[in-house]
Amino acid sequence: IESDNTIQKLSKKDNCFAIAIIKKYEMTLQEGNHVVLVNPGDMGNMGTIMRTMLGFNYYNLAIIRPGVDVFDPRVLRASMGAMFHLNIEYFDSFEDYLKRFPSHDIYTLMLKGATNIHKVESKEGYHSLVFGNESSGLPDEYLDYGKSIFIPHSHHIDSLNLSMALGMTLMHFSKDEFKDKEVL
């Protein structure tokens, strides 16, 4: 209805012509390899991460609170629909996550990581790849969880963008799955 300003009040976009009310789907993680994000804060990064995960056959995303709302329109838009293929679950703490998945091999991605990612081989069984916040990374206490690893890069930068580091890590950990893949 042209005279109704409700859509304009609810939408953050100028060219919105319809609004839908939906119930949020409650998701839980399944067994398998996981990506764990500790306190992620960037909406665009979150959507890009979801899309990248799907591209490398990672279907489980754990988010340690506080973290972005995966149902935010900016996240949904950036995910290009990937979100609807993932299992996503929020946890109040990393310890709560570990209680649910105690048998996973833990790999923490950190600037102070002990092992170069190129020297890490994924073991049999499931693993969890743990990444920190975009601006601060993982706190030093995460050095005590599992195996801490780093992605080597030139001295010209301090760190890599979270979604880029995640993409490189997923490529490394899924290299055996895709090594014989032909052009799409």
Describe the function of each predicted region.
Residues T108-D158:
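Active-site/ligand-binding-proximal alpha/beta "capping" segment
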Residues E2-D4, V38, I64-R65, N87, ...:
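Short beta->alpha connector loops at strand-helix junctions that form conserved
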Residues I1, I19-I22, Y90, D105-M110, ...:
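Short, hydrophobic beta-strand segments that form beta-sheet elements in well-ordered domains
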Residues I19-I21, V35-V36, A62, L129, ...:
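Conserved beta-strand segments that form the floor/walls of ligand-binding pockets within enzyme
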Residues E26-K112:
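RNA substrate-binding interface of SAM-dependent RNA methyltransferases
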Residues I1-M43, S174-K175, K181-L184:
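Arg/Lys-rich RNA-binding interfaces used to dock onto structured RNA substrates
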Residues A18-A20, M50-F56, V68-F84, D140-L184:
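Structured adenosyl-cofactor binding patch, chiefly the S-adenosyl-L-methionine
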Residues K9-D14, Y97-L98, I117-H118, D158-M164:
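Short, charged, surface-exposed secondary-structure boundary motifs
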